[in-house]
Amino acid sequence: MKRKLDANDVPSPEVAETKETSDADEADFESLNLDPRLRQALIKEKFTKPTPVQAKAIPLALAGKDILARAKTGSGKTAAYVLPILQTILQKKAADPSLKATTGLILVPTRELAEQVQKVVTTFAAFCGKDVRSVNLTQKVSEAVQRTMLSDYPDIVISTPARVIANLGNSSLSLDNLTHLVIDEADLVLSYGYDEDINALSKAIPRGVQTFLMSATLTSEVDTLKGLFCRSPVVLKLEDKEEKGAGVSQFVVKCAEDEKFLLTYVIFKLQLIKGKVIIFVGDIDRCYRLKLFLEQFGVKSCVLNSELPVNSRIHVVQEFNKGVYDIIIAADDQEVLGSKSKKAKNAGADEEEEAAGVMGSSDDEEAEDDKKSNRPDKRRKLTAKEKDYGISRGIDFQNVACVLNFDLPTTAKSYTHRIGRTGRGGKTGMALSFVVPADQYGKHKPTSFPTAKHDEAVLAKIVKRQSKHGHEVKPYHFEMSQVDAFRYRMTDGLRAITRLAVQEARAREIRQELVKSEKLKRHFEDNPDELRQLRHDGELRSARIQPHLKHIPEYLMPSKGRKGISSEDVGFVGFRKSSDNRIRKARDKNRAKGKGRKPSGVRKVDPLKTFNRGRK
């Protein structure tokens, strides 16, 4: 791949990477000289102070510099490139109100992330009127509709690389006036199989375009994109002060394969974790197996995987952020599918994939990646659905209390991005991972999963990477003497989850979500109140439901768990319904106390004797 040429047809020089940190930066949005309409939107969204990546990147962007920024997930990278683009558009519209041209192109690897970026653009452009128009090309609409959307020359286009190339091919999209190019989650764009699209796009982009590359890690993929699109970029490696603290507490539990289900049952039924939880599993079948298992015990959850329609996936994330659901079971097989194939036994072959820590790879690891970037690429080609789906990266999950790695990921890089879903924005969170020891692998065939064979080797790499960045992965021990009391109930619930039940649940869920996603989309746009009743955590009922499993007998409850589930003093609870008339009983009681009686000495009047007929 060639490096991008500048205006004089000279390859852009490589720039030494200077480490930028977020040391005592007292910048605020007022000092950034943004348009008043943008400041008004920031005030409405309660943005009082820029994050470190925003404080560093926005002034450089307004000065016209190309930027390659590495900052952790949840650090405000989206606003760091959206605000400068909007500022430039507003300045151009002020000089020429009749200007119509697509000047900003934002590339993302997944549809979910495209929807998220579109919302950020809409939020910040809320007070700009018709001066700023944006289009999301990842929406599931026909080619004719997309052509109509692009015919009015929107200012900003948000898309995956494949959609951009498709619209360039049919002349629906013009990049002749492009001034800003953003590649968000840059390290994932090539990993998701967009290599050919990116190469074609590099030839279609005009010279002199300002480029933003945003990523949580700096890998060989990012270096490739830097050579294709950037001209002497300023490299920002930001480390938040918050990150140096204990933002995410990391724990690991070593257990047998069937004990994963037992511990999950105990955790949720005894409410050992308070708040919202994301459970990561290895593939789609595991999604439904775990959901059906939790249904046996009355624990509601919703699934998220690449088979579901994109509108349903986006709606699940939105409702989860609003607090409608507390548990999401997500199939995160894309990090594995998109990474370079390797054997987990080979420690050396993993180095390129596992340039991780919570902040990403260190400088030494990046240098090692560069040396190994010449190895042949053995990626498995992803399907269109798999390209569009990604759950452990980029998606803005809000207020997640815990990430539960039901199936341990195959790389430390994937682990880093998974636990990045919690502890965002300076908040605390917890990551709990189940690890199957080598001597326990394959002993329980119905619950066995292939990647568990290498859990211990992967865990060693995870611990090594996290320790380099000052983070400790601590062992966590359950009191198995108390947990074992629930084992027979777990066995009963697991026995009902057959392979056929999983297949039926999978097919039924897709049918239900297709109806919700396609036929009712426009109806719900006109009737937003009815959308609130559309839930994704209903029971699939493809497995045999055993009602007695939904309730925990008191004799099974540990003393601490009993206190947590129910209050000791609940007051009087009546189990017998009185057949007496309540009002008559109260009236008699009042009369006995002297209330409602006539004063003594007053002569009783017979109404029949005192009735006077009116005169005619």
Swiss-Prot record:
Belongs to the DEAD box helicase family. DDX56/DBP9 subfamily. ATP binds at residues 71-78. The keyword Chaperone does not apply. A motif (Q motif) lies at residues 27-55. Residues 1-29, 340-385, 579-616 are annotated as: Disordered. Gene3D superfamilies: P-loop containing nucleotide triphosphate hydrolases. This is ATP-dependent RNA helicase dbp9. The lineage of its organism: Eukaryota, Fungi, Dikarya, Ascomycota, Pezizomycotina. A motif (DEAD box) lies at residues 184-187.
